[in-house]
């Protein structure tokens, strides 16, 4: 089956449509048909619809053609991944995408993930970082979740295990391929190959949004916050983590903007104040707190002892600012006013005014506006 998938060319529309098995690992790779409605055109945000399906698997799609209802632009689903990546990428984006595909998420010989002994994907780091994200997100099986910069599924697989539907986007195609291998059976995950800076989303369509990407400029982050606020439902919740300008960096006078490694990915370290200022215009309720503290020499201790010390550090005033990440939890997205849209107002005031105007045998209007 893998060999057959490699030989298939979705650009050849005359090929026979193949129905694939509806059980087993192949089902995780499909694009859920009921989540196609969440895709939008890169040009005008028009809804995308399936026009030609070349390969189907039960309720999922492996290869198909997508069509914009407004402008007619065409996109593809290839091997279960919606290919929405724009050609208009910055040089920095292209540089990062190359690193992600060739170094971080090499797909030449995929293997089960093995945590490193130290660093941000180590077992100790995950114990400090992963639970607080999931606790803040509070997902359930009834939720539709948007995950931006999903990577190889570090969080996606855990959220999918709770039964939630997930639209998972990343601009590393290899990360999305690895993601399919790491999802639990029956996971409802739609993989999207896209740049989150240019990804268009439907309004008020998601219950939860998760991001784990620093982005490298204030303008990019604020654009992302605006996009997320529009995509969230009124009672939705957004959780994101960002690199923190922590006490270690401040004490040592280290740069706010740097690369993870020489010629690596560009990142910016943020303060709690800057995080609130950037996200504040788009959410009415915001909470920012440092997580995953880094304390010199603690990592050399036995894992259980190190974990307990770092958990305590994360909870104490002042020293919690040793946290290497900032966790943002935002709710109540701010909506732009819509022309002609009435507000609830005061029922008492409206009732009294209408009664008064009725006694005068006149329409209950305020100038040109009906009450």
Predicted regions mapped to residue ranges:
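A short glycine-rich, Lys/Arg-flanked "PGG" loop and its adjoining helix->strand segment in the class I
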Residues: 222-234
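A short acidic, Gly/Pro-enriched loop at the edge of an enzyme's catalytic core
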Residues: 197-209
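Acceptor-substrate binding/catalytic loop of class I
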Residues: 256-274
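Conserved catalytic loop of SAM-dependent methyltransferase domains
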Residues: 282-308
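Conserved class I S-adenosyl-L-methionine
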Residues: 79, 85-139, 158, 239-261, 356, ...
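A short SAM/SAH-binding and catalytic strip from SAM-dependent methyltransferases
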Residues: 208-220
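Class I SAM-dependent methyltransferase SAM/SAH-binding core
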Residues: 146, 152-198
